């Protein structure tokens, strides 16, 4: 590989970070007079194309350079395409459900606010905990990925890069809040699209495919793992996207429903193309003889073995793209954590500098864990399993037909789904320890058995079983209590219809102060 020199590598990396720092702080200076609400969100202000670039930048991260090629080397064309489609298509969910949630909760800017108004404070805190943990895990995975990738590309120690990235994004995000993240993501998203095109052309010109290796690899054939992924990945990624506050912040920031639909549609197509191209590098690395190499290397480095056949300038372009991807993703996680913590834990009443300080403090354990982090893909899967047990029972509340569905059922269902995974693993493997390891997806998705598949079936199915059992328990308790006290049994009574004055047919973009509704019923 045309590996840049020590001096060139440092110059490319730190000049890129410096450019983003200057850009971010310059924008923050222009926004220095913004009010607290604008720091946390930007409801009803953004048009379609900035939204599209933001969804692209927020959905990507440097980890895609390892995870998608790795899946391609393990499952071939089938698994790679399933992964790309499963990652891109869930963006459309925000176009479909975003308008519904905004009409029900126009003053919100994260999903947890809708959960508070629909299911009560305890359910909101439960989802908030899951959201913050998910963002924490994603921050770890992003730092771990950028550290590993910089080492692979340049031979440099990844730790200083991880620290500099934390410092840069923390400075401009703490100064400007969500708007900074939105504007920098627009720039970074544009850069990434351009750099992807350049890299694709370079690979097409410089890499030679060996026809014999194409047939020998077996990548054009379907596999058992590939068919398992056809279920696992859509469930995992679809549900996990609900935990990512950066997507909800951008959903609420759209000026109109039409802008939102155009934005997510463009982002979906762009993400599908980008992720397919990145994943294809794993196939091309194998078919060109660059991977697995001698001695054989992990599939997660397939993309970087391919770079050995490319000139130095391409590696420099990839390095800039990697830093841009990682910075865009990381500042999105930070701004999402600030907005979520402020809204969920403090009801936006605490001084914003206190929230900023908490986010800065969280950076220390993030860096410490990222240094020792396992596979980036495994971190994603742990978060996916948690969301697969929580989100399905949560979504029932979007329908007015399930007005009797309460927060008690949501929490019991979420915990019960994880417990069901443990029970399944214990029975399937014949060991409680193995059942616990299945909760951490320690064997990944490619162990050759049905453990991971069963876990992602057990999580949503178990959550519904436990949730409906909780519903029966709650209704029984409330019925018995009503008989004992002489009070009417109202648990199944439909809620009073909102007056015409309260109904909002369209999402308001005016600057009026909207009074937050009270919490919904938990029990």
Q: Where are the regions a protein language model picked out?
A:
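Loop-to-transmembrane helix boundary motifs in multi-pass membrane proteins
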Residues: 118-125, 136, 332, 339-378, ...
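Helix-loop-helix module between adjacent transmembrane segments
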Residues: 81-173, 236-237, 322-332, 351-352
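Selective recognition of specific alpha-helical transmembrane segments in multi-pass small-molecule
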Residues: 129-140, 191-202, 229-242, 257-289, ...
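Hydrophobic, small-residue-rich membrane helices and short re-entrant helix-turn-helix hairpins
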Residues: 108-116, 177-186, 243-276, 291-302, ...
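Hydrophobic alpha-helical segments and their helix-loop junctions in multi-pass secondary transporters
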Residues: 27-32, 136-143, 147-152, 156-164, ...
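Terminal cytosolic tails of multi-pass membrane transporters
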Residues: 31-35, 429-523
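Membrane-interface helix-loop-helix modules in multi-pass membrane proteins
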Residues: 40-107, 247-292, 305-325
């Amino acid at each position: 590989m045309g590996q840049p020199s020590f001096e060139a590598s440092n110059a490319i990396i730190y000049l890129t970070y410096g450019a983003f720092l200057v850009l971010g702080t310059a924008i923050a200076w222009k926004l220095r007079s913004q009010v607290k609400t604008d720091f946390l969100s930007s409801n009803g202000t953004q048009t379609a194309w900035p939204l599209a670039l933001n969804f692209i930048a927020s959905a990507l991260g440097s980890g895609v350079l390892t995870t998608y090629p790795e899946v391609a080397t393990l499952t071939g064309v089938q698994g790679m395409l399933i992964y790309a489609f499963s990652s891109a298509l869930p963006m459309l969910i925000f176009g479909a459900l975003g308008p519904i949630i905004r009409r029900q909760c126009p003053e919100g800017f994260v999903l947890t606010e809708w959960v508070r108004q629909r299911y009560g404070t305890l359910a909101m805190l439960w989802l908030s905990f899951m959201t913050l943990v998910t963002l924490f895990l994603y921050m770890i995975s992003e730092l771990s990925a950028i550290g590993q990738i910089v080492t692979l590309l340049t031979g440099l120690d990844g730790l200083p890069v991880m620290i500099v990235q934390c410092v840069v994004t923390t400075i401009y995000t703490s100064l400007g809040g969500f708007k900074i993240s939105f504007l920098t993501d627009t720039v970074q998203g544009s850069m990434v699209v351009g750099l992807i095109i350049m890299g694709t052309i370079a690979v097409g010109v410089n890499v030679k495919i060996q026809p014999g290796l194409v047939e020998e690899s077996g990548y054009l054939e379907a596999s058992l793992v590939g068919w398992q992924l056809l279920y696992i990945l859509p469930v995992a990624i679809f549900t996990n996207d609900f935990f990512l506050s950066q997507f909800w912040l951008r959903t609420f920031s759209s000026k109109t429903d039409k802008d939102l639909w155009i934005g997510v549609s463009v982002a979906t197509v762009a993400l599908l193309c980008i992720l397919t191209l990145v994943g294809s590098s794993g196939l091309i690395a194998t078919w060109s003889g660059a991977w697995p190499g001698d001695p054989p290397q992990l599939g997660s480095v397939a993309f970087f073995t391919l770079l050995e056949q490319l000139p130095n300038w391409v590696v420099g372009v990839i390095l800039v793209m990697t830093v841009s991807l990682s910075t865009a993703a990381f500042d999105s996680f930070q701004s999402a954590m600030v907005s979520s913590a402020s809204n969920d834990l403090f009801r936006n009443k605490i001084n914003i500098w206190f929230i900023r300080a908490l986010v800065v403090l969280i950076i220390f354990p993030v860096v410490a864990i990222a240094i020792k982090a396992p596979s980036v893909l495994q971190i994603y899967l742990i978060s996916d399993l948690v969301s697969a047990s929580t989100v399905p029972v949560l979504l029932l509340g979007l329908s007015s037909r399930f007005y009797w569905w309460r927060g008690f059922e949501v929490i019991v269902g979420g915990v019960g789904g994880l417990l069901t995974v443990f029970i399944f693993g214990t029975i399937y493997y014949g060991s409680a320890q193995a059942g616990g390891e299945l909760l951490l997806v320690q064997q990944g998705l490619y162990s050759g058995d049905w453990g991971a598949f069963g876990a992602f079936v057990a999580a949503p199915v178990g959550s519904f079983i436990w949730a409906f059992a909780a519903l029966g328990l709650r209704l029984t308790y409330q019925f018995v209590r009503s008989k004992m006290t002489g009070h009417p049994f109202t648990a199944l009574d439909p809620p009073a219809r909102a007056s015409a004055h309260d109904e909002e047919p369209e999402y308001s973009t005016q600057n009026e102060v909207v009074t937050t509704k009270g919490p919904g019923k938990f029990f």
